[in-house]
Amino acid sequence: GVAKAGAHIRKKEERYVQNAIQSGIQGVFLHGMFFTVWLAVLAVPLAQTIDNSVGILLGEMFTTGSSMVLWALLLFYCSQILKLSGKNHLLLLGYGVMDLVFVITSTILFRMENAGILSIVLGSVIGMAAGAVCLCVILCLQRKTRPDALRGLAIPAGCCCACGLLAFGLEKLLFPHVGAVVTVISELIITLLLYWFLLLLLRCLRGQDFQYIPGGRLMRMLGKMFRL
């Protein structure tokens, strides 16, 4: 998505830039929300897959910081587009907001809750969210575009909830019998395919969107397979 949008920016094809950025932001929310829910639900099996000796603490960190996936993707995408547009000075504003919010929230949470490392994780989430939203707003204002609230937020959020419930049920069913590794891999494949199917079924994506969204070709193949 970044590469194709950057190509349109360099060629000064303004009529394509808005569509590319809108589809790119939509793609960020589509995949960011899915992996946020997936990480939150499967925090314990994933933590035990990485290091079983600190599985409980690592699981709490994954659960608390799961939304960082979404904000990191949004921050990266908006940063790259603004950089390609020659708006480096605006990046300083976004990252300045992120650092300031992180320091303030981490300090407050650490003193109030005395949660140790979890206060830093939560502060990082809040700070990154503030920076990502700030850069996203700046980018939309600069390019005079805005995300589609229905196709970019509402429908994916509903699909993520459905996949999250399925992942929760499968985790309770599989984890005690097949272990952490098999549970994590199998649930990732099953829930991701279901998520893509629901997005296609609900017409969340249009023809041009597949060009700018990671995995767009695979999603289009899945749609043709089920005639969606």
Predicted regions, residues:
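Small-residue-rich midsections of specific transmembrane alpha-helices
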Residues: 1-4, 27-28, 35, 207
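Hydrophobic residues within alpha-helical transmembrane segments
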Residues: 30, 34, 63, 93-97, ...
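Membrane-interface helix-loop junctions in multi-pass transport and translocation proteins
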Residues: 56, 86-136, 165, 169-189
